[in-house]
Curated annotation (Swiss-Prot):
Listed InterPro entries: PDI, PDI_a_PDIR, PDI_b_PDIR_N, Thioredoxin-like_sf, Thioredoxin_CS, Thioredoxin_domain
UniProt similarity note: Belongs to the protein disulfide isomerase family.
Main subcellular location of this protein, as a coarse class: endoplasmic reticulum
Keyword Isomerase: yes
Keywords: Disulfide bond, Endoplasmic reticulum, Isomerase, Redox-active center, Repeat, Signal
Source organism phylogeny: Eukaryota, Metazoa, Chordata, Craniata, Vertebrata
Name by which UniProt lists this protein: Protein disulfide-isomerase A5
Signal peptide positions (record): 1-21
Originating species: Mus musculus
Length: 517
């Protein structure tokens, strides 16, 4: 008996020792009551909740999150729910936390503005979690990309100065901003180049968008993003300005780094000669009156698509203008010089084609090749009306936007949502199957198939909140709460089978209740 009592005392000592070794910040709120969590989500708009299978499973995460909570104090809230605790099991079940798989010991869920935002799926590091809580809708850190492991990631001016002082190897430094589209385009090539030259040359990256880096931006003339600078033995030599380069281009340049060469100014298209007529604000109206059939290309000197189309347009003009029987002519307007014409015809993209018949503007289809230009000018007809968009078609699919998304989903027990982009070929392929599925269940008021066009401006925040990273993405919602990502067959059979399984589950639960009564 004494030995047993001694063993119990020993256990009693061990457990408190373990608990004391896990330094949990007082800033982490431990919650077990559903009402308490509901109240917290209602009063805090940026909450990260750690759900754990047990206290032991939460130990390492609690140590990390204690530091996170201190770093985001006043900006975000960190909570912990121990699903192994009898009092908390009901809460975990209510929040649809599934820790049943043997390898799943914890879940990190993020809630924003009182609603579930996403399952945290980024790197479980102090830097990544803090960055996420400071900007939940922002992109992941560059260093979270496994392919960027050979890029040196700089976080502070102190680290940057230390790198310049200590690094003996040549250094190519990219100063960037996380939101910059040009930066995102070159990053995969930059990191691939870093791997190829590893051990010989250092490639590094630094997000200098925050205001704390104004000194660095001034010192290295960072006027736009990205700005890439080449250093040797800590001394800045010159910038690297080929922002459209591939990994191979970067590696090749690093073999013999040279400063940017002065650019030879391009000859304006109008001064090159050729068969195309070049019109201005002053002579445009008179020209289209004198020619019964005129196709006009509005262009900009810097526009890559214009440069690609220019030789096709010139070749077509040579054929048309050399045919005595042809009444059609091709003309061009530099919209950057002739701003009055550009404004008058609402030119907002380049190249833009306008067609004039006897001085009157008429519709023109999308033309890009010599053959199409010639065919159109030989028989200019009004293009057929564009096919109605998916949203304009009469179907049973609910087309939602950010304003009505939450309210609509809350009214439906089961909703399968397709997040898509109209230009996406995979989306176009699956639309008929998804539409047929919606039609199949249109009589069931508890079931809906909905779609969100992520390209629309008013939907972009919503698609970010729902963690849509590719098109199409399918999510299943139960009374407005995200339950799971649908990853089965993207066919009518796959969709209908999934929804029927949900409906069969409802029937089984109903029968069980009746039996209990």
């Amino acid at each position: 008996m004494a030995r047993a009592w001694g063993l119990l005392l020993a256990i009693g000592v061990v457990l408190p020792t373990w608990l004391s070794s896990t330094k949990v910040s007082s800033l982490i709120e431990r919650i077990s009551d559903p009402k308490d969590l509901k109240k917290l989500l209602r009063t805090r708009n940026n909450v990260l909740v750690l759900y754990s299978e047990s206290e032991v499973a939460a130990e390492s995460h609690l140590k990390l999150l204690s530091t996170v909570a201190q770093a985001v104090k006043g900006q975000g809230t960190v909570c912990w729910v121990d699903c192994g605790d009898a009092e908390s099991r009901k809460l975990c079940k209510k929040m649809k936390v599934d820790l049943s798989p043997k390898d799943k010991k914890i879940e990190l869920f993020h809630y924003q503005d009182g609603a579930f935002h996403m399952q945290y799926d980024r790197a479980v590091t102090l830097k990544s979690i803090v960055a996420f809580l400071k900007d939940p809708k922002g992109p992941p850190l560059w260093e979270e990309d496994p392919g960027a492991k050979d890029v040196v990631h700089i976080d502070s001016e102190k680290d940057f100065r230390r790198l310049l002082k200590r690094e003996e190897k040549p250094l190519l430094m990219m100063f960037y901003a996380p939101w910059c589209s040009m930066c995102k385009r070159i990053m995969p090539h930059f990191q691939k180049a870093a791997t190829q030259v590893r051990g010989h040359i250092v490639l590094a990256g630094m997000n200098v968008y925050p205001s704390e880096f104004e000194n660095i931006k001034e010192e290295y003339n960072v006027r736009g993003y990205p700005t890439i600078c080449y250093f040797e033995k800590g001394r800045f030599l010159f910038p690297y300005e080929n922002y459209g380069s591939t990994a191979e281009d970067i590696v090749e340049w690093l073999k013999n780094p040279l400063p940017p060469q002065p650019q030879v100014p391009e000859t304006p298209w109008a001064d090159e000669g050729g068969s195309v007529y070049h019109l201005t604000d002053e002579d445009f109206d008179q020209f289209v009156k004198e020619h019964s059939s005129v196709l006009v290309m509005f262009h900009a000197p810097w526009c890559g698509h214009c440069k690609k189309m220019k030789p096709e347009f010139e070749s077509a003009a040579e054929v048309l203008h050399g045919d005595a029987e042809s009444s059609g002519v091709l003309a061009a307007v530099d919209a950057t010089v002739n701003e009055a014409l550009a404004g008058r015809f609402h030119i907002s993209a380049f190249p833009t084609l306008k067609y004039f018949k006897n001085g009157e503007q008429q519709a023109v289809p999308a033309l890009r090749t010599k053959k199409k230009f010639i065919e159109w000018m030989q028989n200019p007809e009004a293009p057929p009306p564009p096919e109605p968009t998916w949203e304009e078609q009469q179907t049973s699919v609910l087309h939602l936007v950010g304003d009505n998304f939450r309210d609509t989903l809350k009214k439906k027990k089961h909703t399968l949502v397709m997040f898509y982009a109209p230009w996406c070929p995979h989306c176009k392929k699956v639309i008929p199957h998804f539409t047929a599925t919606a039609d199949a269940f249109k009589e069931d008021r508890k079931i809906a198939c909905a779609a969100v066009d992520c390209v629309k401006d008013k939907n972009q925040d919503l698609c970010q909140q729902e963690a849509v990273k590719a098109y199409p993405t399918f999510h299943y919602y139960h009374y407005g709460k995200l339950v799971e990502k649908y990853e089965s067959d993207r066919t009518e059979l796959g969709f209908t089978s999934f929804i029927r399984t949900l409906r069969e589950g409802d029937l089984k639960r109903l029968e069980k209740r009746r039996e209990e009564l």
